[in-house]
């Protein structure tokens, strides 16, 4: 059985915070932020919008895109590091909101790589015949765990949610290969205490090495080469990290998603948010070979070779 994406949706808050806005509250500049990260602005949720609200809105759009209802969903997986509370899970909030009365529901935590973990967990459940339709959501309100006095982290993050419905697709479409990995010895480099804490130098070194390597490994597993890749959707973390992955695949710039300028790093939601953007812009077409790749705290990483279409 081939398993792929049947529908996709996203939600981003209306409030835009630009680099110039940040100049007013901390010692930084638009030039400093753009040069080091590629970010110009990010969306920030106000106090009335929490992680579950964003997740529900993205889920509704994914269901609509898939042409199914909540009652058709068998399992809900939510990747988040900013749940509204320890329990109930964000997935359970979604279950009630979309009327998925037949669905099991749980959250998982793999930081910015969480969507990749959720996507492959869903694929495995579907491929074994356990479930038919699985809703996978990445949703994070990182603005609530960022120290707004720390220019090294505060400038990076935004809020948002992305969701996909996964199920059976035509032969040759969907997930062709994948890789998930973790290195717990690097957990000290990126973690949450009261706020997000990051050793930027070490995270950069890890990400530059791991993203490119993961892309090449999933291609090899699928019996494909760099020349077969039509589009790259990396986790939107840092322009220099993303460029390193693109260069490893010998792709031109127009073949890589770069939504970081508009949305910043939205953690587990960054890949589906970027995919929606590229679909709307017509840059992802039916039959395209897409590489999805992400990394996050843990340290964790994941990559998927995906043939787009149903």
From Swiss-Prot:
GO terms for cellular component: cytoplasm. InterPro entries: ACP_syn_III_C, ACP_syn_III_N, FabH, Thiolase-like. The keyword Lipid metabolism applies. One of its GO terms (molecular function) is 3-oxoacyl-[acyl-carrier-protein] synthase activity. The active site is at residues 112, 235, 265. HAMAP family: FabH. Catalyzes the condensation reaction of fatty acid synthesis by the addition to an acyl acceptor of two carbons from malonyl-ACP. Catalyzes the first condensation reaction which initiates fatty acid synthesis and may therefore play a role in governing the total rate of fatty acid production. Possesses both acetoacetyl-ACP synthase and acetyl transacylase activities. Its substrate specificity determines the biosynthesis of branched-chain and/or straight-chain of fatty acids. This is Beta-ketoacyl-[acyl-carrier-protein] synthase III 1. It comes from Bacillus cereus (strain ATCC 14579 / DSM 31 / CCUG 7414 / JCM 2152 / NBRC 15305 / NCIMB 9373 / NCTC 2599 / NRRL B-3711). The lineage of its organism: Bacteria, Bacillati, Bacillota, Bacilli, Bacillales. The gene is fabH1.
């Amino acid at each position: 059985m081939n398993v792929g994406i049947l529908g996709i949706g996203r939600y981003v808050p209306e409030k835009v915070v630009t680099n110039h806005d940040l100049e007013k509250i901390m010692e930084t500049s638009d030039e400093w932020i753009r040069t080091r990260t590629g970010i110009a602005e990010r969306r920030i949720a106000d106090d009335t919008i929490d992680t579950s609200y964003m997740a529900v809105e993205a889920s509704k759009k994914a269901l609509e895109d898939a042409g199914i209802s909540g009652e058709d969903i068998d399992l809900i997986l939510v990747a988040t590091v900013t749940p509204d509370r320890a329990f109930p899970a964000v997935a359970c909030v979604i279950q009630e909101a979309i009327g998925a009365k037949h669905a099991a529901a749980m959250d998982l935590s793999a930081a910015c790589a969480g969507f990749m973990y959720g996507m492959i967990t869903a694929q495995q459940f579907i491929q074994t015949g356990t479930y038919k339709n699985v809703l996978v959501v990445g949703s994070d309100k990182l603005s609530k765990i960022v120290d707004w006095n720390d220019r090294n982290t505060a400038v990076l993050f935004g809020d948002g949610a992305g969701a996909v419905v996964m199920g059976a697709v035509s032969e040759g479409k969907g997930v062709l290969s994948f890789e998930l990995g973790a290195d717990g010895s690097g957990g000290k480099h990126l973690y949450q205490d009261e706020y997000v804490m990051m050793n930027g130098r070490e995270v950069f070194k890890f990400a530059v090495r791991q993203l490119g390597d993961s892309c090449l490994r999933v291609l090899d597993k699928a019996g494909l080469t760099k020349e077969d890749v039509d589009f790259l959707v990396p986790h939107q973390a840092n322009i220099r990290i993303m460029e390193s992955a693109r260069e490893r695949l010998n792709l031109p710039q127009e073949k890589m998603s770069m939504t970081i300028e508009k949305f910043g790093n939205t953690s587990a939601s960054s890949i589906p948010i970027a995919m929606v953007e590229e679909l709307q812009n017509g840059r992802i077409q039916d039959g395209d070979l897409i590489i999805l790749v992400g990394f996050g705290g843990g340290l964790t990483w994941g990559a998927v070779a995906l043939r787009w279409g149903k």
